[in-house]
From Swiss-Prot:
Quaternary structure and interacting proteins, as annotated: Heterooctamer of four alpha and four beta subunits.
Active site annotation, chain numbering: S24, Y57
Record EC number: 4.1.1.11
Cofactor: binding comment: Binds 1 pyruvoyl group covalently per subunit.
Cofactor(s) named in the record: pyruvate
Entries under NCBIfam families matching the protein: panD (TIGR00223)
Post-translational modification (record): Is synthesized initially as an inactive proenzyme, which is activated by self-cleavage at a specific serine bond to produce a beta-subunit with a hydroxyl group at its C-terminus and an alpha-subunit with a pyruvoyl group at its N-terminus.
Name of the protein in its database record: Aspartate 1-decarboxylase
Keyword presence, Cytoplasm: yes
Pyruvic acid (Ser) PTM sites in chain numbering: S24
UniProt similarity note: Belongs to the PanD family.
Residues that, per the record, bind substrate: T56, G72, A73, A74
Length: 155
């Protein structure tokens, strides 16, 4: 089994840090559902401001709140306004990778969803892996892709 990307919240901003809590990250259930992230699921958090990388579990906040609250020890690594990448994982046999299509959500400064993307791995005629980023409208985007900036795949 290999650890692969299950879903991603890219560029979501910390709305609060709560040191006096038992731990975890509190997220808007609507964001979690759209990215396929479950309550109590362990996620990796990468802070784009500080470079800190931590692992914690998800608890659900109020639906529609757009919250991203770091709790307990995690609050020491992320401050309100910090931009994060939150990534869940799945474990699959490598042969199953072409069946995987993790959701990737990008966010504006107010934690509104800007883009709903999916990662796609296929094999070409020679059996080589091909990686793509697929937009909600089905457009294939060229990696690397800057958040919020579409680049069409070269023909």
């Amino acid at each position: 089994m290999r650890k692969l990307v299950g879903g991603k919240l890219h560029g979501i901003r910390v709305t609060e840090s709560n040191l006096e809590y038992h731990g975890s990250i509190t997220l808007d259930p609507a964001h979690c559902e759209a990215a396929g992230i479950l309550p109590l699921e362990f996620v990796e958090i990468w802070n784009k401001n500080s470079g800190a990388r931590i692992t914690t579990y998800v608890i659900l906040g109020q639906r529609g709140s757009r919250c991203c609250v770091l709790n307990g020890a995690a609050a020491r690594t992320c401050q309100p306004g910090d931009e994060l990448i939150i990534c869940s994982s799945v474990y699959l046999d490598g042969a199953e990778i072409t069946n995987l299509s993790p959701a990737v959500l990008t966010f504006d400064a107010n934690n509104n969803i800007v883009e709903r993307l999916h990662y796609s791995v296929t094999r070409d005629g020679a059996g080589h892996y091909q990686f793509g980023i697929v937009a909600e409208d089905g457009e294939i985007l060229q990696p690397p892709l800057k958040s919020g900036m579409r680049q069409k795949r070269a023909s």
